[in-house]
Amino acid sequence: MKRKTLPLLALVATTLFLIACDDRSDDLKAISKFKDLTPPRFSDVVSHQDDVSEEWSQVDYLSGPTLQVLRTRQSPDGCEDGSYYYLVDMQEKTVQPLMNALCIADNIKLEYQEVTDPYTKEKYFEYAHDGKLMGQLLIPSNPDNQE
């Protein structure tokens, strides 16, 4: 009985792994169709799954990821080490770089958080290193997103 169970478990695990890989590829295709808010365009920097790694993700337990930070393997022009970092708003279907050229070495880790202005109710995305704010980005609504 145990001999039959082991190959079955291996088959199920392999199938789940392949489904997860395919899902990541589908997510990347969907993101490349989102509205680019500022250059460089996401689709100009990323063409397939190997070009990007997920840096950070904010997840709503009912709807899945709401915000994601994706780090690319391509370095900005004039930058020896470093990567492009893109903020992806899964609900508004927008993508924008954190900065046009965020030249940060791979060993530096950033912290991320979404902040809502208590007066205007506008949403911002902040990124910091060692507790020091490095940048703040407005998370705009997308009028083209008619869901």
From Swiss-Prot:
- Name of the gene encoding the protein in the UniProt record: yafY
Covalent lipidation (N-palmitoyl cysteine), chain numbering: 21
Q: Where is the lipid attached (S-diacylglycerol cysteine)?
A: 21
Task: Provide the protein name.
Answer: Lipoprotein YafY
Answer whether the UniProt record assigns the keyword Cell inner membrane to this protein: yes
Q: Where in the cell is it found?
A: Cell inner membrane
Q: Mutating residue 136 to R has which effect?
A: 2-fold decrease in degP induction when overexpressed
Pfam families per record: YfjS_YafY
